[in-house]
């Protein structure tokens, strides 16, 4: 009878512990649903608004620096593999089978009748048997610490009844923001990876020299002009002097002096050396002065002849 009483007390204490666990679970569920989840949802809404407003600046700085920030990305939906789905379905089926077996054993244990005990145990007190058969347990005055049980009384659980250990699933959090896991950190570390430089195609420059409405640039004019050496420059100056002398003789009427000419710049004639150009211009000016003097003297002689 001592063993029977101990089993009865143990079952009642177990049921009381289960009731207490159920009450604690309901309390935790009520706390999570009424207090924690609304705060988390409100925080998520505020974070979404902040993220939407900062997207423009993130893209602007990435484009200006030609980099990409990898720590502040939006979550990307993870594609599920068919093999993972098969493993999950097999594990759920095994859990359901184990749960049904445990329920069946509990029902058999709760509906234990008098026929399962020996005659010596049945001939005991009827009140004890009635208390044992009742479904609603009574609170015992004895606590769990006062009850002492031998290790042999506890039957070990068979291996086929134990829940198989699951392998840790390595779910890669691809595309998820790393900042969500470091909310309380003070030092932010964001990985920055440079992008590949874009190959800019060389744009064809419009040939402005070919257009009749656009004047050529002075650089192209200088490049097109042939470089004059000393012989060509002296030859050009001599030809210019002869042409000027002939033009004076043909244009000016008789008895009038030709106009005085200005000093020519050596740069307009394309002379390379400035010193040589100055010397040539001085010699040319002297020749012109002598011509003017001779012409004046000739005019004076004609006037004297007329008188």
UniProtKB/Swiss-Prot annotation:
- Keyword Disulfide bond listed? The answer is no
Q: Outcome of mutating residue 136 to A, per the record?
A: Abolishes phosphorylation of dam1 on 'Ser-143'
- Compartment(s) where it occurs, according to its Swiss-Prot or TrEMBL record: Nucleus; Cytoplasm, Cytoskeleton, Spindle; Chromosome, Centromere, Kinetochore; Cytoplasm, Cytoskeleton
> One Pfam match, by short name?
DASH_Ask1
**Upon deletion of the gene, what happens?**
Sensitive to thiabendazole and osmotic stress. Double knockout of mal3 and ask1 leads to cell shape defects, including 6% T-shaped cells.
Q: Keyword Iron-sulfur: yes or no?
A: no
A single GO BP: spindle attachment to meiosis I kinetochore
Extent of Polar residues compositional bias: 250-284
Q: Which Gene Ontology cellular-component terms appear in the entry?
A: condensed chromosome, centromeric region; cytosol; DASH complex; kinetochore; mitotic spindle kinetochore microtubule; mitotic spindle polar microtubule; mitotic spindle pole body; nucleus
Keywords (alphabetical) are: Cell cycle, Cell division, Centromere, Chromosome, Chromosome partition, Cytoplasm, Cytoskeleton, Kinetochore, Meiosis, Microtubule, Mitosis, Nucleus, Phosphoprotein
Q: Residue positions of the PTM Phosphothreonine?
A: 136
PANTHER family with a match to the protein in the record: DASH COMPLEX SUBUNIT ASK1 (PTHR28200:SF1)
Subunit record text:
Component of the DASH complex consisting of ask1, dad1, dad2, dad3, dad4, dam1, duo1, dad5, spc19 and spc34, with a stoichiometry of one copy of each subunit per complex. Multiple DASH complexes oligomerize to form a ring that encircles spindle microtubules and organizes the rod-like NDC80 complexes of the outer kinetochore. DASH complex oligomerization strengthens microtubule attachments. On cytoplasmic microtubules, DASH complexes appear to form patches instead of rings.
- What family is this protein classified in? Belongs to the DASH complex ASK1 family.
Name this polypeptide is given: DASH complex subunit ask1
């Amino acid at each position: 009878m001592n063993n029977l009483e101990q089993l009865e007390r143990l079952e009642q204490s177990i049921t009381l512990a289960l009731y207490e666990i159920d009450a604690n679970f309901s309390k935790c569920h009520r706390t999570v649903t009424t207090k924690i989840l609304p705060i988390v949802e409100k925080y998520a809404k505020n974070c979404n608004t902040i993220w939407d407003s900062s997207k423009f600046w993130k893209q602007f700085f990435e484009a200006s620096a030609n980099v990409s920030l990898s720590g502040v990305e939006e979550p990307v939906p993870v594609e599920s593999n068919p093999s993972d789905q098969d493993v999950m379905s097999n594990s759920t089926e095994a859990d359901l089978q184990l749960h049904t077996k445990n329920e069946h054993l509990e029902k058999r244990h709760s509906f234990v009748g008098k026929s399962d005990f020996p005659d010596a145990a049945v001939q005991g007190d009827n009140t004890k048997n009635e208390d044992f058969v009742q479904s609603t347990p009574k609170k015992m005055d004895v606590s769990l610490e006062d009850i002492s049980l031998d290790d042999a009384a506890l039957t070990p659980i068979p291996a086929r009844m134990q829940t198989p250990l699951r392998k840790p699933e390595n779910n890669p959090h691809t595309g998820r923001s790393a900042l969500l896991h470091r909310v309380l950190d003070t030092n932010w570390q964001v990985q920055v990876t440079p992008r590949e430089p874009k190959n800019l195609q060389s744009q064809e420059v419009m040939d402005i020299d070919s257009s009749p409405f656009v004047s050529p640039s002075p650089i192209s004019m200088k490049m097109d002009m042939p470089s004059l050496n000393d012989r060509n420059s002296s030859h050009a100056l001599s030809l210019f002097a002869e042409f000027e002398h002939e033009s004076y003789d043909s244009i000016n009427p008789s008895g009038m002096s030709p106009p005085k000419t200005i000093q020519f710049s050596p740069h307009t004639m394309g002379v390379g050396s400035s010193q040589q150009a100055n010397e040539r211009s001085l010699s040319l000016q002297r020749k012109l002065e002598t011509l003017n003097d001779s012409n004046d003297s000739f005019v004076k002689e004609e006037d004297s002849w007329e008188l």
